[in-house]
């Protein structure tokens, strides 16, 4: 039956940045589909751990600043040592800094680029090596953005990094498909998370945004559950190098 293709029973998913918001929603979706979760965060994701384990799934919490890539191989080695294998990687951890392009600092450029694109590549590289060694392939899902497609304003390093995420997703898909590794991305639209709290509090700006979204509402972390389970499951085995917009129709407007 087709529904069995969406089952993730027995799988292990590594999810970065899953303490709140979209990362938490995706981790919970994967756990509901059957995954045990390895969460990599800069803080202990207490709420996520509680919700995942309440589903009867295991959760391994690892603490790291992924802007520093030296420790990435050891993180995935630790995950494999704990569970025996890893099957899915979700590169969700991200950072945004806002300033006019004329005033944007090197530090704000480097901090965002190091986390949003550099860590994505080296996390994927380390995971792919495990997938190849295990011999069963794997799934890598990167988190892109509407600014992978659009320019935006006052977020130069974020736009550059998310454009890079979509590009490197395609490259890795091209190189690793022969190893049965699927690499795809999700581009969330305007989501009701901590990152958009200021925007949502601005009544005029929030109204302008909602007027542009055909669905007429802000997205929720739960809106990513279906797409992440699809891309992590065998139902997407012939989907490779693609970025799925989950934006209520924003990009279609």
Curated annotation (Swiss-Prot):
Record flagged with keyword NAD: yes
Active site as annotated: 158 (proton acceptor)
InterPro entries recorded: 2-deoxy-D-gluc_3_DH, NAD(P)-bd_dom_sf, Sc_DH/Rdtase_CS, SDR_fam
Key words, A-Z: NAD, Oxidoreductase
Enzyme Commission (EC) number: 1.1.1.127, 1.1.1.-
Thermal properties of activity per the entry: Optimum temperature is 37 degrees Celsius for the reduction of 11-DOC.
GO biological process: D-galacturonate catabolic process; D-glucuronate catabolic process
SUPFAM superfamilies in UniProt: NAD(P)-binding Rossmann-fold domains
UniProt-annotated binding residues for substrate: 145
Similarity annotation: Belongs to the short-chain dehydrogenases/reductases (SDR) family.
Subunit text: Homotetramer.
Stated name of the protein: 2-dehydro-3-deoxy-D-gluconate 5-dehydrogenase
Organism of origin: Escherichia coli (strain K12)
């Amino acid at each position: 039956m087709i529904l069995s293709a969406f089952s993730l029973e027995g799988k292990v998913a590594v999810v970065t940045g899953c303490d709140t918001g979209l990362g938490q929603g995706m981790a919970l979706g994967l756990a509901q589909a059957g995954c045990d979760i390895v969460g990599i965060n800069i803080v202990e994701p207490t709420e996520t751990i509680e919700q995942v384990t309440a589903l009867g799934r295991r959760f391994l919490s690892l603490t790291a600043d992924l802007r520093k890539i030296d420790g990435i191989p050891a993180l995935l080695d630790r995950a494999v040592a704990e569970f025996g294998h890893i099957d899915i990687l979700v590169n969700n951890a991200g950072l945004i800094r806002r300033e006019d392009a004329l005033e944007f600092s090197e530090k704000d450029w480097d901090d965002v680029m190091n986390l949003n694109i550099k860590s994505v590549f080296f996390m994927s590289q380390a995971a792919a090596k495990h997938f190849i060694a295990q011999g069963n392939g794997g799934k890598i899902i990167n988190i892109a953005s509407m600014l992978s497609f659009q320019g935006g304003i006052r977020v130069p390093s974020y736009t550059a990094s998310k454009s890079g995420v979509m590009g490197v997703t395609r490259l890795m898909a091209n190189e690793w498909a022969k190893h049965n590794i699927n690499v795809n991305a999700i581009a969330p639209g305007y989501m009701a998370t901590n990152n958009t709290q200021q925007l949502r509090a601005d009544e005029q700006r929030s109204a302008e945004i909602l007027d542009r979204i055909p669905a007429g509402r802000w997205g929720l972390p739960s809106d990513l559950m279906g797409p992440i389970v699809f891309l992590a499951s065998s139902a997407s085995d012939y989907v490779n190098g693609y970025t799925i917009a989950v934006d209520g129709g924003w990009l279609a407007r």
